[in-house]
């Protein structure tokens, strides 16, 4: 019988997390469940910092970026001694289950606590869109809008100065944001971690475009592939074209969530309560073909793989 649960946000924040918190709280209250907000992710659970949330506690947060509960990375959770303290705090607080909003690292933490007997439901909250078992993660579409706005502005100045602009996009090891940004932003080149990248190949393509009369270009690249400032210098040296690199950085994580992220987060938050009431307690939520689904969190973190969007890449290559 689920009477009292905790909700936390973990790892990198993403726009829409507040909407998910709101969804969990209000759906829980509608079923007579007490919901406690745990501050700063797993760290707050370790330190036993939590507060009872009411209907009014989550008023006026659906439109806010970030997370009102705070977030953190807490790799110490992998230690047996730390997990023992966490489980003791869960027991002392009489929490029957946890709802954990975050990325794949947060899911691993949820899996570990589930293994120790605490029912956990994972909700995918990350702009990277790199979580298995879901087409989209909370925050992805808002981050994409932020990136497109930046690319549009860079195109204005790149066109004026006839220069090449490199835009580094977040995503870790997933190129979804970069591919989508390249299509929506009209980028001339796209570089993602899923495909092998050679700087000289890019230079050759830029030279070909220049020979065809192209006077400026935008290159979208996922983070961690290379040093974009070194890449800019290499391109400038090889082509003679002024080249500048822009790292969008953490600005991509901020801002008011767009409507789709608010709706997705609200649906997933409410669905987490539905799953707990049905007896699920080792699962993560996803959306596939616009329908909410759930998967065993062990499968999602160990065996399932995020499907690569070859269709988007094919489109990007045709248009770039």
UniProtKB/Swiss-Prot annotation:
An MF annotation (GO) of this entry: monosaccharide binding
Pfam families cross-referenced by the UniProt entry? PFK
Name the domain of life: Bacteria
Which processes are annotated in GO (biological process)?
canonical glycolysis; fructose 1,6-bisphosphate metabolic process; fructose 6-phosphate metabolic process
Print the keywords alphabetically: Allosteric enzyme, ATP-binding, Cytoplasm, Glycolysis, Kinase, Magnesium, Metal-binding, Nucleotide-binding, Transferase
* Record flagged with keyword DNA repair: no
Localization recorded for this chain is: Cytoplasm
Gene name?
A: pfkA
Q: Know the name of this protein? A: ATP-dependent 6-phosphofructokinase
Which positions bind ADP? 22-26, 155, 186-188, 212, 214-216
What functional role does this protein have?
Catalyzes the phosphorylation of D-fructose 6-phosphate to fructose 1,6-bisphosphate by ATP, the first committing step of glycolysis.
**A single GO CC term, please?**
6-phosphofructokinase complex
**Reported cofactor(s):** Mg(2+)
Say which enzyme class the record assigns.
Answer: transferase
The answer to whether keyword Transmembrane applies is no
Q: How is its activity regulated?
A: Allosterically activated by ADP and other diphosphonucleosides, and allosterically inhibited by phosphoenolpyruvate.
Classification via NCBIfam families = PFKA_ATP, PRK03202.1
> Hey, which family's this protein in?
Belongs to the phosphofructokinase type A (PFKA) family. ATP-dependent PFK group I subfamily. Prokaryotic clade 'B1' sub-subfamily.
| EC nos | 2.7.1.11
Q: Which reaction does it catalyse?
A: beta-D-fructose 6-phosphate + ATP = beta-D-fructose 1,6-bisphosphate + ADP + H(+)
Q: What is its main location?
A: cytoplasm
Q: Which InterPro entries match?
A: ATP_PFK (IPR022953), ATP_PFK_prok-type (IPR012003), PFKA_ATP_prok (IPR012828), Phosphofructokinase_CS (IPR015912), Phosphofructokinase_dom (IPR000023), PKF_sf (IPR035966)
Q: Which residues bind Mg(2+)?
A: 104
Annotated positions binding ATP: 12, 73-74, 103-106
């Amino acid at each position: 019988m689920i009477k009292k649960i905790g909700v936390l946000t973990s790892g990198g924040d993403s726009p829409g997390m507040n909407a998910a918190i709101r969804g969990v709280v209000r759906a829980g209250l509608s079923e007579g469940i007490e919901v406690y907000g745990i501050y700063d992710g797993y760290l707050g659970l370790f330190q036993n910092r939590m507060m009872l949330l009411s209907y009014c506690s989550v008023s006026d947060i659906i439109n806010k970026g970030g997370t009102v509960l705070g977030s953190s990375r807490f790799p110490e959770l992998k230690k047996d001694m730390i997990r023992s303290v966490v489980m003791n705090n869960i027991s002392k607080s009489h929490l029957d289950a946890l709802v954990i909003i975050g990325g794949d690292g947060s899911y691993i933490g949820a899996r570990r606590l589930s293994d120790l007997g605490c029912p956990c439901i994972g909700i995918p909250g990350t702009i990277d869109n790199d979580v298995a078992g879901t087409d989209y993660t909370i925050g992805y579409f808002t981050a994409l809008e932020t990136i497109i706005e930046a690319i549009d502005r860079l195109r204005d100045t790149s066109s004026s100065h006839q220069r090449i602009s490199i835009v580094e996009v977040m995503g870790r090891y997933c190129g979804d944001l970069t591919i989508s940004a390249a299509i929506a932003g009209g980028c001339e080149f796209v570089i993602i971690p899923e495909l092998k990248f050679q700087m000289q190949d890019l230079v050759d393509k830029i030279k070909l475009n220049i020979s065809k009369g192209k006077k400026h270009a935008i290159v979208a690249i996922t983070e961690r592939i290379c040093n974009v400032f070194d890449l800019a210098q290499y391109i400038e040296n090889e082509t003679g074209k002024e080249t500048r690199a822009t790292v969008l950085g953490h600005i991509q994580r901020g801002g008011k969530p767009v409507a789709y992220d608010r709706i997705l987060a609200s649906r997933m938050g409410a669905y987490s309560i539905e799953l707990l009431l049905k007896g699920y307690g080792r699962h993560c939520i996803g959306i596939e073909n616009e329908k909410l689904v759930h998967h065993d969190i062990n499968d999602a973190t160990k065996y399932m793989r995020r499907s690569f969007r070859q269709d988007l890449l094919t489109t990007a290559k045709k248009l770039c």
